[in-house]
Amino acid sequence: MCLGVIMVLSTTAEAQAPAPVVSPEVSTDRRLTLRFRAPDAKQVTATGELDGQPHPMTKGTDGVWSVTIGPLAPDIYTYAFNVDGTSALDPQNTNTKLGYGSFGPVSVVEVPGDGPQFYDAKPVPHGEVRIRPYESKALGFSRTVWIYTPPGYETGKDYPVLYLLHGAGDVESGWVLIGRANLILDNLIAEKKAKPMVIVMPLGHTIQSFWTGPAKALPNEMAAAYAKGGLDAVLFALMSGDGKGGLSPFAKDLLDDVLPMVEKSYKVSKRPEDRAIAGLSMGGGQTVNIAFNRPDLFKYVAVMSGAVTGKADQIYSKFLSNAEQANKQFKLFWFGVGKDDTLTGPGDREFAQMLAKYGITHTARVTEGRHEWTVWRQHLNEIAPLLFK
């Protein structure tokens, strides 16, 4: 009798259990369907890098909201749900990108192409990604740096180094977990389009790394700048370093702690001709701050959708006014932005015009896209073959 009761209760519970939600779902024609169970919600919207637009979702009789988007181009997309004003991850999707501060984590989905894309793993020799803890004397707490070593690293020596900086919404893992920098370089090296190189990916925020201990941080200068003057003030602050054109606290960490550690512990060259620095968005502003202060250290510079403005000459006038010397310092000054980037795009265009005004030799690229990883993966794929020539 007891067994019969248990069986009846079990059957009843199964009958009452809601059907599992499938999300995300990518169809063969590259349409993306997202679903989110929220029977009591009044409004649910899908947001993110999908196609630049928020997508209101429709509620079904089962309390599951859904929307179908596309067809989308083959790529890696981030998204989240806005549920009555609150951001939420896709609970059915374990593929998540870490975020920082108000940007928060987001869900990730890849829409496949007809074959492997330039950022996908292919049957080629692969390098390694190492997570290296270190004590930052410049900042006063523990941090980690992610380091890519190319295939065959153990048998080589004096590799060139690319210092690759992330944006405000990411941490040091960003260029690997969502940017696929390691796979992009594996593929380029296998195709003999890029030289084998070490890539150093530091934490761009002046905080203790999430995985090294309790939260510690310097005062958030960007938040203070935004409170005073909005986005323009933030861009100027990132580009100007200490506010006067000197090195920022992050830059001091990179140059005084990370760079010496890398050159002591890894098989890398110490020649400026074998160093490059590149960054996206916030990292682009940091790249300018470092490159203009220490042009003797890096012969290759690349800025992707950089947090910069045309007001750079207010703080770097001495450097910019001597174009002949500046042009001798850099073998490459590369500058790129997405055509539809409304966040840093206006400042980027002003900055490019300022470089031209002062006669600074540079390569300017405008690519399809907005302020998003779709653009930055393409940028890295284009930049890497230009380095260390």
For each of these PLM feature ranges, what is it?
Residues 13-15:
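Boundary at the C-terminal end of the N-terminal hydrophobic targeting segment
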Residues 26-54, 59-389:
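Non-catalytic cap/lid and distal C-terminal segments of serine-dependent acyl enzymes
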Residues 1-10:
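Bacterial N-terminal signal peptides
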